[in-house]
Design a protein with these regions (language model features):
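Binuclear metal-dependent phosphoesterase catalytic core
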Residues: 14, 171-173, 236-244, 248-249, ...
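Binuclear metal-dependent hydrolase catalytic cores centered on His/Asp/Glu-rich metal-binding motifs
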Residues: 127-147, 173-212, 229-238
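Active-site-proximal segments of metal-dependent phosphoesterases and phosphodiesterases across multiple
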Residues: 115-125, 187, 208-246
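Core catalytic region of metal-dependent phosphoesterases/phosphodiesterases
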Residues: 47, 52-172
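Short, conserved loop/helix-junction motifs that constitute active-site signature segments
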Residues: 60-62, 89-94, 206-207, 231, ...
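Beta-strand-turn-beta hairpins that frame and shape the catalytic cleft
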Residues: 35-44, 169-179, 208-212, 262-268, ...
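Acidic, histidine-bearing metal-coordination/catalytic regions of metal-dependent phosphoesterases
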Residues: 1-46, 50-57, 111, 290, ...
């Protein structure tokens, strides 16, 4: 199915005001399971937006078959942050650990690292590396750390304890999981693309047989409402998810205050942001069980 560009795509708040007239959004309050998943189901544990704050997490990460992190596992993508995250995720008990990048993983985005001296933003203005740093909030990181992160090549190779997805998929016991880091332009961070055609071109890469979709950005209308009352989600992502891909689950983060689960009656949307609006890692992981294809068992 061909997905078009919504005329209000540049204003997701206005777009959702129109779209919501024909949309169903049901909030779901899910409790953590107290028993193991049966043999015909895959238990998936979701987190996002931990921002190098995993040492301060006060909850236990539930056991499961698959662990998904939907991006922003660092503050700026520095090598030390990536190494520390890799060590942390390596200590989790899950057999399959899947990670995507978010807008904070500057060193993972080749448009920042190759070359460092030139970067083209969505408004087609070229900036030197210095002015890029001037545009980016540091979250307590030094400008030197930001510069070093942006200049670090092949940093993905340091994620040795998980599977890193970037416009790619992995199949776990017949369940197809696709991960993509892109999001509508946001403060000239990593993996930013303009709303509309540029975003849609990324979503067109997602296979139609995806069971679990992992993006960093939310779709418009689900887990994307900011504290200012503005919607930050992508209009074309919602349209793509609902009309072409139709996954069973859509996992994301990015908008901390959007944490939680919702459904449109067919697809379950999960904003798994661990950090809250104040960048405190207070939100517990979200867990779900997905039924395996007929005849497939974990054993």
């Amino acid at each position: 199915m061909k997905i078009g560009i919504h005329p209000l795509t540049a204003d997701p708040t206005a777009a959702w005001r129109e779209l919501s007239q024909h949309q169903k959004v049901v909030k779901i309050n899910a409790k953590l399971p107290t028993t193991q998943a049966p043999s015909d189901k895959l238990r998936v544990v979701c987190m996002s937006d931990t921002h190098s704050l995993t040492p301060f997490i006060k909850f236990d990460v539930p056991a499961g078959d698959v662990f998904i992190h939907a991006g922003d596992f660092t503050k700026c993508g520095s090598l030390q942050e990536v190494i520390e995250f890799n060590n942390w995720i390596g200590n989790l008990p899950h057999k399959h650990k899947i990670v995507i990048a978010g807008n904070h993983e500057l060193s993972f985005d080749r448009t920042f690292t190759h070359p460092f001296s030139v970067h083209t933003s969505g408004d087609h203005q070229k900036h030197t590396g210095t002015s890029i740093l001037d545009d980016i909030p540091t979250l307590g990181m030094s400008k030197d750390a930001l510069a070093e992160a942006i200049k670090t090549n092949n940093i993905k190779d340091y994620l040795t304890n998980c599977t890193y997805l970037e416009d790619s998929e992995i199949v776990v016991h017949g369940i197809k999981i696709y991960g993509t880091p892109w999001q509508p332009e946001f403060c000239k961070w990593a993996f930013n693309v303009p709303r509309g055609e540029a975003c849609l071109s990324k979503w067109e890469m997602i296979p139609t047989d995806t069971d679990i979709l992992v993006t960093h950005t939310p779709p418009v209308g689900h887990g994307d409402l900011c504290c200012t009352g503005v919607r930050a989600g992508c209009v074309e992502l919602l349209s793509t998810v609902q009309n072409r891909i139709k996954p069973k689950y859509h996992v994301f983060g990015h908008i901390h205050e959007g944490y939680g689960i919702s459904s449109d009656g067919k697809i379950i949307y999960i904003n798994a942001s661990t950090c809250d609006l104040n960048y405190l890692p207070n939100n517990p992981p979200i867990v779900f069980d997905i039924t395996l294809p007929p005849g497939v068992q974990k054993s």
